[in-house]
A protein has these predicted regions:
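Low-complexity, Ser/Thr/Pro/Gly-rich disordered linker/stalk regions
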Residues: 1-29, 33, 113, 159-171
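Beta-propeller-forming repeat regions
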Residues: 3-5, 90-95, 115, 123-124, ...
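Secretory/extracellular carbohydrate-interaction modules
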Residues: 9-79
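Beta-strand-rich interaction surfaces with strong enrichment in secreted/lumenal proteins
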Residues: 14-21, 91-97, 136
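Short tryptophan-centered beta-strand motifs in secreted/extracellular beta-sheet-rich domains
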Residues: 28-30, 100-110, 114-116
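Short, aromatic/His-centered strand-loop micro-motif at the edge of beta-sheets
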Residues: 83-104
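Extracellular beta-strand elements of beta-rich domains used
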Residues: 107, 147-151
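Flexible glycan-contacting loops in extracellular carbohydrate-active proteins
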Residues: 125-148
């Protein structure tokens, strides 16, 4: 709109996208001017290229998979097929390019034929069927100008596009009929008015749940049951000026009495409150900064807080805290259930933003997967990934952003799956740290693992990307083979698993500005769309109904806490019910792993 030209590179390296993922046979053209002979990095997927590449992107499957017709430096025109970090040349011609004027680039996509023109003259027309449809746009990794960009389609292509959209909508509507839809069940009173956040907590019996409610100003926490009945309230000192960034409180049964206790940081102190009574059990000041992080002599920049079974049951849980900044952390402090110091460990390289805990060797004590280092309960380093003994190429690729650990293949062998920033997705042997697979999909950041595909053995790992290429989702089997890849939007890095039907296949809870908000199947289809309240709520899925392992939905909005459930019962004749065992190591949102389990239907 308006007058041009526009300098896309004022924003840095960019891919400007329009249309939708269903477009096939279109013509895209624009006048492009190459200004300078150096590029701008970091790049979405051209970081390893010194060349200046500016032009047209066609059939964009995601922001790292598309065709790219471009002016390259000042001496050639090239058509690339972009596949993550690979750029496959499909056509190229050497021709002088004039930096003082705009050149007309045109790409005509018809079936598997890609006809490319420069200044009205055909330069090559390769055949390639890798990408059959997708968005279209403008791509720039150097200072360039674009004028008169347009996309056209003939009548046949337009009618074909409408037919595909209509068929897709009918198929999706039919698919949605197979799934229960959410219906409002009841409202749960809040312990006190005003904004706040909710954390589920266990009370006594395995299926008895309540919640902690934290006031928006961080100065008050209440414990209540799911009827809204207040159990107790504690007043906190509130954040200190030098406190680290706010972190979620933890609900964990530290003392083993059946009630999840309250563990949090308040006014530069770690505090533990009894889940049964709300009484303060222990507190201690945060440690001073450890080596290589923070300011010496000042409070450590604490980022993470966990309760871990480092000693065999029935011993109480231990507490660990970790420092962190935007690039991860280096120090781990361990305390017992009375917050008495046990050990401190400086790790050899930075960990990321989510840890995992599992009894790897079968001795009844959990090991701690801190980034790419496995520690035992005494703080000993058992192994570290060989990959982390050098800095992988890329601006942000030297730590594990998030990890999951478990029997991913369903054969009893424990595996690590790690989203490792610019190094992509890694699969490793949890007993030795040997890397088994690597897949570079961009800056891999978010991860969950669950039975997303009913007929696949084990559980499936869903990885999502972030910096420089937001929103690509890749689903793997437990061995690390790709099962599906899609891009719901350009902001998300993952969702979380939801056991909605108890039939052995979990759905993905996702709030997407482009694809909608609700529950998606493993092929990226929105099969359970949310209504208005659920769309704007913080939604917490959890099995809350006795005898029904399906997740219900707690919807927290500024106005109320609402409980939503399925609009139909479990079908008659479904005698075995899927009831996965989940671990939420960081609150209940990040790095979730959902282990398969089946239970008999109650009589």
């Amino acid at each position: 709109e308006g007058e041009g030209p526009y300098l896309l590179s004022k924003l840095g390296d960019r891919l400007l996208i329009a249309g939708d993922r269903h477009w096939r046979d279109v013509t895209i053209r624009a006048r492009v001017r190459q200004f300078f002979s150096w590029n701008i990095s970091p790049s979405v997927n051209l970081s390893y290229r010194d060349a200046c590449l500016n032009g047209l992107a066609c059939r964009i499957r995601d922001v790292r998979s598309y065709y790219f017709l471009c002016l390259e430096d000042f001496d050639r025109v090239t058509l690339y097929r972009i596949e993550d970090d690979e750029q496959i040349v499909l056509g190229q011609v050497f021709v002088p390019l004039d930096r003082t004027r705009f050149h007309l680039l045109e790409a005509r996509c018809r079936g598997d034929r890609l006809t490319c023109l420069l200044d009205g003259r055909e330069v090559f027309a390769p055949v390639d069927a890798t990408y059959s449809s997708g968005w279209f746009g403008l791509r720039s990794n150097a200072k360039a100008g674009f004028l008169d960009a347009e996309v056209t389609a003939d009548e046949e292509a337009w009618q074909g596009h409408l037919a595909r959209l209509g068929a897709g909508e009918r198929q999706l509507a039919s698919l949605r009929e197979q799934y229960p839809q959410p219906v409002f069940q009841r409202q749960i009173p809040r312990p006190f008015e005003g904004p706040g956040s909710l954390q589920l907590r266990r009370v006594e019996a395995e299926d008895a749940w309540g919640f902690f409610w934290t006031a928006g100003d961080g100065r008050r926490v209440a414990a209540a049951d799911l009827e809204g009945q207040l159990r107790w309230t504690v007043d906190l000192e509130g954040p200190a000026p030098e406190d680290p960034a706010p972190i979620s409180l933890k609900a964990a049964d530290v003392d083993g009495d059946g009630h999840d206790d309250l563990l949090l940081i308040d006014h530069n102190k770690v505090k533990l409150f009894s889940g049964r009574t709300g009484e303060l059990v222990a507190e201690r000041p945060l440690p001073l900064s450890g080596p290589l992080m923070g300011v010496p002599g000042r409070t450590a920049p604490i980022g993470y807080l966990y309760a871990v079974r480092f000693r065999p049951a029935p011993a109480p849980l231990d507490i660990i805290i970790l420092d962190a900044d935007a690039g991860g952390g280096r120090n781990v402090w361990c305390y017992d259930h009375q917050l008495r110091p046990r050990w401190h460990r400086l790790l050899p390289f930075a960990f990321g933003h989510n840890m995992h805990f599992l009894d790897v060797d079968g001795d009844g004590r959990d090991e701690a997967m801190i980034g790419h280092c496995l520690l035992n309960g005494d703080g000993d380093l058992l192994w570290s990934l060989e990959e982390m003994h050098y800095a992988p190429h890329g601006a942000m690729g030297i730590h594990a952003d998030s990890v999951v650990l478990g029997d991913l293949e369903g054969n009893g062998a424990l595996r690590l799956a790690s989203v490792s920033g610019d190094d992509g997705v890694l699969f490793a042997d949890a007993a030795t740290g040997e890397i088994l697979r690597r897949d570079r999909i961009g800056h891999a950041q978010g991860i969950t693992a669950a039975r997303y595909v009913r007929d696949e053995p084990g559980i499936q790992v869903l990885a999502g990307t972030r910096h420089r290429a937001y929103g690509i989702f890749v689903l793997y089997n437990g061995k690390g083979d790709r099962l599906h890849r899609w891009q719901p939007d350009f902001v998300n890095q993952n969702g979380r698993p939801v056991n909605w039907t108890a039939d052995g296949e979990e759905l993905l809870l996702l709030s997407s500005p482009d694809s909608g908000t609700g529950l998606f199947d493993w092929r990226g289809r929105l099969v359970v769309p949310f209504g208005e309240e659920l769309r704007r709520a913080t939604v917490i899925p959890h099995p809350l109904a006795a005898g029904d392992p399906r997740d219900q939905l707690l919807a927290v909005t500024p106005e109320r806490i609402a409980l939503y459930t399925q609009d139909r019962p479990i079908p008659a004749g479904q005698e075995q019910l899927f009831s996965p065992v989940r671990h939420y190591w960081r609150g209940n949102t990040i790095g979730v792993i959902s282990h398969p389990r089946w239970v008999a239907r109650p009589a």
